C-alpha cells in the first residue's frame, strides 16, 4: 500500500508497495506540481488549525452561556429546595397549634429551691445529663428537680398558714375591740337603766309615802279596798264579862286587818285604817269600852270632813242603805253595844 500525489492531493495506492513515494526530478512539471502540493498541504493544515480555532472561539460563548444556564438551573433548584424546607418548617412550627404550645411551654418557668428556671434550660440539663451520665444521670437529675418542686410546695404552704394566722389574729383583735366597745355600751345602758329604775323607785316610794300619809275615811277605805265583812262577837260594856252577843247579834268587821281577832275586842277606827294601808306605825288597841273625849272626837271628825266631801256625789246611793249609816255612824266610835243593835243588812235586832 502506497501513497500517491494526484493533483496536489495525497491518494492511497493499493497497487504500489508500501515503500515511500519517490520523487523524481525527470521533468520540470512534476517538480512544480510537487512544490504546489507540498505548499498546499501545509496551507491546508494551517487553514484547518485556524478554522478549528475560529470554531472554538465561536463555540466558547455558547459554551459559556450553556455553563451559565446550567449554573443558574442548579441555583434555582437549590433555592426551590430551600424555599420548600422553609415553608415546611414554618407550617410545622408557626401554624400548628401543638408546636406553638410546645414553644410557649418551653418559655415558661418554675420555682425549684426558690429559684426560677425556664423549662428549656431544664430540658437542656436533662439531655446533657443523659448524654454524659446516661440513664442513671437522667434519673438523678429528675429526682433532684422533683425534690426541689416539693420543697417549694412546703414553703408556699407555710407562707399561706402564716398569712392565715396573721389574718385570724387581726380579726380576733378587731373582735375583741368590738366586744369591749359593746360591753362598755351595755354597761352604760345598764347603768342608765339602773339609775332610771332607782329614780322610779324613789318616785314611787315618795308617792307611796304621800299616799300612805293621806288620811282616808272609813267609807273611802271600804270602797277602795273592796272589803268583805265578817261577823265577830263583841263584849258589851254594860253587862258582865260572861254575857256575850249571840251569833245573830254581831258586828261587821273587815277580813283584811291582821290585828282583828274574833274575840270580844273592838278596834278603833285609826287602827283599822292603819292596818288596811299596811303602815309600819300602829295605834294602841282598846277594848270595847273604848271612849273618846269630845275634843278628840271633834278633831277626828274634822280630819274626815274634807275627804268625805269629795265622795258625797258618788256615795249618794250608798248613803241610802242602813249598813252605811251603821258603819259611818259616830256612835260606833263611842260605844260598841250600839253596833250590835243592827245586822249587816241594816235590820234592827234589839238591845241587850
UniProtKB/Swiss-Prot annotation:
Subcellular compartments: Membrane
Compositionally biased spans, kind Low complexity: 50-72, 193-213
Renumbered residue ranges of the record's region Disordered: 41-73, 193-219
Membrane topology: Single-pass membrane protein
Domain of life: Eukaryota
Residues passing through the membrane, by range: 131-151
Entry annotated with the keyword Repressor: no
Cysteine pairs bridged by disulfides in the record: none
Primary location class: membrane
Glycosylation sites: 14, 52, 70, 165, 186, 192-193, 203, 289
GO cellular component, one term: membrane
UniProtKB keywords: Glycoprotein, Membrane, Transmembrane, Transmembrane helix
Name of protein: Putative uncharacterized protein DDB_G0274369
Organism expressing this protein natively: Dictyostelium discoideum (Social amoeba)
